[in-house]
């Protein structure tokens, strides 16, 4: 019995399509469909935690005393500009390729900003990454008050000992039972 070449090709294409769809469904990181997770991943990858800390309170790092993102009054656009262009005269690096060269920042080019030019980040971010990290800061850090156990677990996961310091601060309202501090 001879095989129908058209049916074989169609069956092969169907199998390949199903394999690609299943690979996308199972291989896709959950962050791709969750904007907050994308922003958090960028916050970690770009090492924002190096100066602003995981909770966004800032307070210092290798670049100096970083501003608190929890108390900032910056708008989304201003956060995006700060991430893109850094902060002249500070240790806050710029994350946009071409900042001060092909793109003016704060209405200045490299010559105009002079020796106050911010450092270049170790890695450049795409515009969509810059938007995602700004959205993450606005949704999960800005205006949130003091950091707590639930926020720490949301950032690091429940296997990190980093969050142990916040256990005594946890309240049932935050969805986490408070620790008594007693050990057995």
Positions of predicted regions on the chain:
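Sec/Tat signal peptide C-region and signal peptidase I cleavage site
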Residues: 21-27
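Conserved beta-strand positions that form and line the central face of beta-propeller blades
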Residues: 67-69, 91
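Non-transmembrane alpha-helical segments in soluble domains
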Residues: 40, 80, 84, 131-138
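Short, cysteine/histidine-rich loop/knuckle motifs that typically chelate Zn2+
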Residues: 50
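N-terminal secretory signal peptides that target proteins for export/translocation
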Residues: 1-7
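Flexible coil segments in periplasmic/lumen-exposed cytochrome c-class electron-transfer proteins
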Residues: 28-34, 45-46, 54, 93-184
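Bacterial N-terminal signal peptides
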Residues: 10-21
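Short cysteine/histidine-rich zinc-coordinating motifs and their immediately flanking basic loops
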Residues: 60-66
